[in-house]
Amino acid sequence: MERLLESIASFAAQQPQHLALADNAVILSYCELLQEIERVAPAIGGRRVGLLMDNGCAWAVIDLCLQKNGVASVPMPTFFSDCQLQHLIDDASLDTIITDQPLRIIKLLQTSLSTELTVAEQKFDCFHLNPVEKSPLPARTAKITYTSGTTGQPKGVCLTGESIERVTESLSEVVAAMAQDRVLTLLPLSTLLANIGGIYAPLYSGSSAFLPDMAECGMAGSTGVNAELLISTLNHVQPTATILVPYQLKILVEAASRGATLPNSLRYVAVGGAPTSPVLLDQARELGLPVYQGYGLSEAASVVSMGLPGRKHNSVGRPLPHIKVRIADDGEIMVSGNLFSAYLGQSPRTGDEWPTGDIGHLDSDGELHITGRKKTSFATAHGRKLAPEWIESELTSHPAIVQAVLFGEGRDFNTAVVVPNCASAAPKIADVISVLNHTLPDYARISRWIIAEEPFSFRNGLANGAGTLDRSAIETRYASQIERMYQGGECNAFL
């Protein structure tokens, strides 16, 4: 990460008083940021350092200190369960944990011994461990980012500083980042996308990065969103750019449709992390939101492609300059040119390409289109192949439906498990599905559905930390109800 640190030093000389980082309580100019990095870096020891912290200036400063020290930075998602955090600590062989949540660490480590570290006017606890190193790190590992996955324990993706910088530089180039930009981060900094889009790219470009704590901007856990606080944060910061997941965009669109005022400062809103309904994107654009889809994965150091102004709205954009995309014969998206070194504890990655597990195509203009997941696509009993994400994104584009999962592998018709926006919205779902069915080919229509008992979340094991639904877990949880739908039992039906 030498080039990023050099950029910060350069901007500290060129524009010393220009705002670099800000959160709810702290503002750091580029000069102050450089001074804080130089002050804090010598105080942080260890070789594998975990960060269990809320968003804020301190998170960014500590992470940059670790890069300066040549130490592996290991973000620890605050939305992980205690079991998953324990797995991460053991799997990564952490020797230091820096946290603003000491009680969680005390519970896990069964020790209260820690030292105090002050960063960006905030005090943190430093826990020093004596781990048995399970796995050597691949050469030049700068960051280990844990994917929450949909099955099994989280996996550590080992990335070099060079691979992260290539994405940072490409992203800054294609979005034409400039010093006047104000970039607001509304995703947890424990996610790689938030690191790159919310910290590295702004600082590489001389822009200003705003890192409010998650609760203050309306984020609760990995899935909860308070629309009032979210919109208040947007209007207070007046950002020129931000990154949203589809559910956050849906909340903004619904609020704006009810008369809420959104800032007119935005020139670029990236949406990614899950399939986004074309209907929702159109609604957002009609409200004046400059939304563009992106696509990426941790194994490619985050962003692979980005939609841009003046380009097609129904794609996830062209691949960034630093990476190559190829479509395999079976439709799977293959990426090369900027890949991870290995999963921690596993053999080094081999080959020049990585199979993403996503299905898609490149159009005649070189724009990438995602149609579904290779593992989730299914064939009906009539031999028609279907990517369920397509139907699910159409369902959740309606305000009455928050989440939905489609089933139909080898069956005569499709069924769905649906989460309504609230109890009063449940009666509206029949109308929503009826209208949608009239726009779908016969093999894609929903014939029967049931209302879920509760939202699909990380806490109940029905979604991962990024909000991606765990289809297998949902199918297992509702197996008997799904089977009854196919046997003609009690359910909602259009047969």
List the predicted regions and their residue ranges.
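Conserved AMP-binding/adenylate-forming core of the ANL superfamily
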Residues: 17-46, 50, 54-56, 64, ...
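Conserved AMP-binding A3 loop
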Residues: 29-30, 142-169
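AMP-binding/adenylate-forming catalytic core of the ANL superfamily
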Residues: 80, 331, 336-337, 359-444, ...
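Conserved pre-ATP/AMP-binding loop-to-beta segment of ANL
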Residues: 124-146, 153, 176-183
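Conserved AMP-binding/adenylation subdomain of ANL enzymes
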Residues: 165-182, 189-241, 246-250, 254-257
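Conserved ATP/PPi-binding loop(s) of AMP-dependent carboxylate-activating enzymes
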Residues: 315-319, 328-354, 367, 382-386
